């Protein structure tokens, strides 16, 4: 039974998140329905991580074992045909070793958070970005972000319902770049706590607005207390863009 690695993009807006839910639409559920329609038997699809409701992906990775040999391009096309009209697309399918695990084989996960920093309303990107009307000091945000790089106890920046055994994570990258009215936060790490990226982004926005200094951000991290976190950024600006193996 061959194992296939799938690279997937999706608009998270209509979904309750990646994880299968019995009564709610999920990305995992849409993919498993497409696989069953393609191969004729129920098949579990395992993702590299569970994105929250409203979070998007341009490079999510999953694997599944299919009881039928498909040429990878034929499987990709068949899955895409059965995925319609869901806003989910399989970009690539490839046969991999049966030891490959989308979640546990991952070495690094890359996320992008998109902010549009302008007073005018959004006309074209509603549900795709976070509009912040107050002018943000992106240089101050970037400088403060470097205080979070490295291995830390990120309790302040994790959801109270996070089920991770340890609050310690190693953050490899957290950059803030501006291009016109677009402010983008780029982050990479092997793994994250629940809501960690959105919590860090929201706190950095407070820095950009002048509500916090870099020292305030560092103090929030050191507090190891969820109550010390700034605002949590909304899900619509967050994208899982790549997973390294």
From Swiss-Prot:
Record keywords: Isomerase, tRNA processing
Keyword Membrane found: no
EC number(s) recorded for this UniProt protein: 5.4.99.12
Catalytic activity, as annotated: uridine(38/39/40) in tRNA = pseudouridine(38/39/40) in tRNA
Classification via InterPro entries: PsdUridine_synth_cat_dom_sf, PsdUridine_synth_TruA, PsdUridine_synth_TruA_a/b_dom, PsdUridine_synth_TruA_C, TruA/RsuA/RluB/E/F_N
GO-annotated molecular function: RNA binding; tRNA pseudouridine(38-40) synthase activity
GO biological process, one term: tRNA pseudouridine synthesis
Entry annotation: catalytic residues: 52 (nucleophile)
Chain sites annotated for binding substrate: 111
Function statement: Formation of pseudouridine at positions 38, 39 and 40 in the anticodon stem and loop of transfer RNAs.
NCBIfam families in the record: hisT_truA
Cross-referenced PANTHER family: PSEUDOURIDYLATE SYNTHASE (PTHR11142), TRNA PSEUDOURIDINE SYNTHASE-LIKE 1 (PTHR11142:SF0)
Sequence similarity: Belongs to the tRNA pseudouridine synthase TruA family.
HAMAP family (alphabetical): TruA (MF_00171)
Subunit-structure text: Homodimer.
Designated name of the protein: tRNA pseudouridine synthase A
Gene source species: Bradyrhizobium sp. (strain BTAi1 / ATCC BAA-1182)
